[in-house]
């Protein structure tokens, strides 16, 4: 939405756009999510959001044993679960449709599972890399393992797979974001996600 007004959203919807996102806005807030859902409810359209509380997201890897072992600044798992909880609370309050793009923690799986039990209109996806790689990979300092959301623990992988099997997670996504070679051939902390 970042600067787009509602008339533009209506025009885009009339042209065939089926969903809108705030995912790349660093200004995402409770107010932005609420206003987005209010606007999109009027045209029965989906909001896609990337669950990340920016105030906790200035690290480069999952916060935990491996980030501490190698001395890389961690992104705490609550960065994701706080955003999921917040957005679902807003969804429950005003209604609408929301899709979480890129869940990676067992807490998020549990919260979304509960929301689906309450019949909230929520879907989500998991990046394929969060299903096959865990945060132990960062000990290599290979910048290719600097991804968003960060690689999490083996317990998270187990919960994500369970979420796929029980229908909590709707989509396995690539989350492929092509990078210029120079943005990955550098120190881990300076590399792009």
PLM regions with names:
Residues 182-189:
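Basic, amphipathic juxtamembrane/active-site segments
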Residues 174-181:
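Active-site anion/phosphate-binding pocket segments in diverse small-molecule metabolic enzymes
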Residues 80, 189-193:
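Gly/Ser/Thr-rich active-site loops/lids in small-molecule metabolic enzymes
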Residues 1:
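Aromatic/His-enriched, Gly/Pro-containing loop or helix-boundary segments
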Residues 4-172:
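Histidine/acidic residue-rich metal-binding segments in metalloenzymes
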